[in-house]
């Protein structure tokens, strides 16, 4: 059977590996290096990838593309994208669909197309080594990549001529690599993955099951717009400001100077991991009317650490959340594994050690571990390795908007994937012919404060009173973390489904804010939930009150009808405001008016021998108004589609 290769498609560097026998081989590229710069250049009609593209970057800044992974699956308007626009020498543009693309030589290119060039290089590297055609691969992505970003990565693979058999999370792949030759029994590890453009942390349990290994992800957290590029940019910003003070020239306006600064900043950052100071010397960086300008600035390790201290601090909060979600403390962690080139920085290692209370492992190559793990997963899928079971998770809650604007979770965050879950909902109005289903991702109670992934409609629902139709909504998330949602009318069997293909990705700020907001605004969420519940109970009571007056007919006096109508109007007015206590008071007032009426009607019906099936509690509102058959059914807020066909 043909080999399934493992590819780490990185922001700064990429790597390819394959399992041979019982060992994983990290494959050297044509230049003899085990990693390849994730850089693509367009020059004289030729496409350069890797080291050759990097070498000519200074002389061809506008057509040399790097850190493209930061754009994949993202909207042009994302704050994170806007921030990068001023820091890269190439041109980021807004595509027709609103996504962030790039423009090279007047040609618009999608990030998927550009990433495909890197994947082609990885594919060719593997083919040259194996001496056979490679068509299948496992590709890694940051654990916090959302549906759109995962879809875009699969599309890049397809463009590169690869059948992507599985998308797996980078920290999980690193744990696979770490656990491959470790036979030390059960252990819980933390994988801290600070790469070129993204940060992830996963808490993973490695269990020994009769000689086989089970790698189970307990929780994951992260930041999809935090990585080595941000460390470079912090140093670049400092150099630009220092030069501006000395020479009164803004280097950001010069693409050539910006590219030279980028190269120098990256080199200086690496040097400062092993030395206390370095000199950045860029002669003829620019020129003005007074002549050429030279940039000579000394940078100490302490200065760099001061510039990036906030970036390092931003990685610790996700670690805290991941531990909390896993139900563990730092003392439960046996090993801390560092992955990603930026994790080599002494300050990063120091802060990680301080947080976890133990020195990180030094026996895992941070540049190669992810590709090694991907190759192991590829071997599992091809049948070449059968002693490893991988259980990954989805990073954020998935649900739909229900009555009152509430997000009703279908699949909770940190659920093991693949997973399929269903819940039954109903209509919000009598004779409602269709329902709109809005799918959200996030941790807030109010649906619209989360990320809308997509929506679709289920129509042709037979006329029926509200609460009677049974609409089964199913969420199916596959092993790649890609979601499919379906809705089925249980009475007719009619079904509608959607493969979630959002045009935009979740920005780092959005994802981090979702979880942080959910914790920081717990009280606000509780109040909103209480308000939504009060409104739902009020709406149910109003509906049953109107039905009671209509059904009882002449058994209700005119004065009683007036009292009910007045109380209904007052309750309707109360539901339009945000005062929970007022809604509850008006609800109770309406119940107090209704109870004597329905009780009297019930007694009269009993005396006449016709009380069978009549329940005075049916008009009390809240849950009491629901039929027994509807137990477990949640009212869903759907947009009513008016049927114009009379």
Curated annotation (Swiss-Prot):
Region (Disordered): 603-646
Keyword Phosphoprotein: yes
Keyword Cell wall biogenesis/degradation: no
Low complexity bias locations: 618-627
A Pfam family hit: HSP70
CDD domains in UniProt: ASKHA_NBD_HSP70_DnaK-like
Residues found modified as Phosphothreonine: 198
A GO term, aspect molecular function: ATP-dependent protein folding chaperone
Entry's induction text: By stress conditions e.g. heat shock.
Keyword list, A-Z: ATP-binding, Chaperone, Nucleotide-binding, Phosphoprotein, Stress response
Function: Acts as a chaperone.
Family as reported in the entry's similarity comment: Belongs to the heat shock protein 70 family.
PANTHER family: HEAT SHOCK PROTEIN 70KDA
The name this protein goes by in its record: Chaperone protein DnaK
Organism for this UniProt entry: Acinetobacter baumannii (strain ATCC 17978 / DSM 105126 / CIP 53.77 / LMG 1025 / NCDC KC755 / 5377)
